[in-house]
Amino acid sequence: MIDVFPVRAFKDNYIWIVHNQQFALIIDPGDATPVLAWISQQNLQPIAILCTHHHHDHTGGIPSLVQEFAIPVYGPANEKIPGMTHPLTGGDTLSFPELSLEFSVLDIPGHTAGHIAYYGQNYLFCGDTLFACGCGRIFEGSAQQMLASLQKLASLPDETLVYCAHEYTLANVRFARVLDPDNPDLIKLESTVEEKLKQNIPTLPSSLAVEKATNPFLRCDQPAIIHSASQHVGRHLNDPVSVFAAIRDWKNNFQ
């Protein structure tokens, strides 16, 4: 049986460990220390590292993990990932028979130019592109690129479990409620998220069904989001890219 465990790192990162009580994949290891401790405690044998993008809080632990376990490193072909042995582009497939797992690689640029996601068997590891009720900042791409990447992820089945890399959910929900105040799914989600955090339980994974109902960055064609974005910029916005760009910029400065 497959389990996905969140190893916490830094202030709010999750390093995901996909395992079957014997073998393990390590996803976006920004810090080796907590990973080494948990892997040792569980007596697991790592078989690969999977990276979504080059930012240090997703890759900083790779050299130590490779030194310890001598395992392959998968990552985006056009980004500098330390120790990368298997450069990937969208459309590639990965097979890990030890875990009976297969992943498809999706190109999802925007947060970084080469950002990729890993999708298979209802698991989506999407790094810093799609967050629970939010999305990543646009550092290397355009609003149009980022929206297209989010729409690509939103086209996956509703039951897909979303494993993003940061615990940003409550802040994202509070921003979403400003944009979409009468959305009953958001009101319910806020309560659920607050309760989980009170108990120190991760709010992830989310699901694409929940994201499509609550995430304003996936709902740029909805009247409530269009209205809020238009009011914020002081003019009517009539296309999803303009709405997306307006609310992404708003979120950058939202307190």
UniProtKB/Swiss-Prot annotation:
Protein name in the entry: Hydroxyacylglutathione hydrolase
Family annotation (Gene3D superfamilies): Ribonuclease Z/Hydroxyacylglutathione hydrolase-like
Reactions accelerated catalytically: an S-(2-hydroxyacyl)glutathione + H2O = a 2-hydroxy carboxylate + glutathione + H(+)
Positions contributing to Zn(2+) 1 binding: 53, 55, 111, 128
Any one GO BP annotation for this protein: methylglyoxal catabolic process to D-lactate via S-lactoyl-glutathione
Catalytic activity, EC: 3.1.2.6
NCBIfam families membership: GSH_gloB (TIGR03413)
Annotated PANTHER family: HYDROXYACYLGLUTATHIONE HYDROLASE, HYDROXYACYLGLUTATHIONE HYDROLASE GLOB
Pfam families membership: HAGH_C, Lactamase_B
Pathway the protein takes part in: Secondary metabolite metabolism; methylglyoxal degradation; (R)-lactate from methylglyoxal: step 2/2
CDD domains assigned: hydroxyacylglutathione_hydrolase_MBL-fold
Complex and partners: Monomer.
Database matches in InterPro entries: Clx_II_MBL, Glyoxalase_II_hydrolase, HAGH_C, Hydroxyacylglutathione_Hdrlase, Metallo-B-lactamas, RibonucZ/Hydroxyglut_hydro
Job description of the protein: Thiolesterase that catalyzes the hydrolysis of S-D-lactoyl-glutathione to form glutathione and D-lactic acid.
Binding site for Zn(2+) 2: 57-58, 128, 166
Any one GO MF annotation of this record: hydroxyacylglutathione hydrolase activity
Cofactor remark: Binds 2 Zn(2+) ions per subunit.
Enzyme class label: hydrolase
Family that this chain belongs to: Belongs to the metallo-beta-lactamase superfamily. Glyoxalase II family.
Cofactor(s) required for function per UniProt: Zn(2+)
Record key words, sorted: Hydrolase, Metal-binding, Zinc
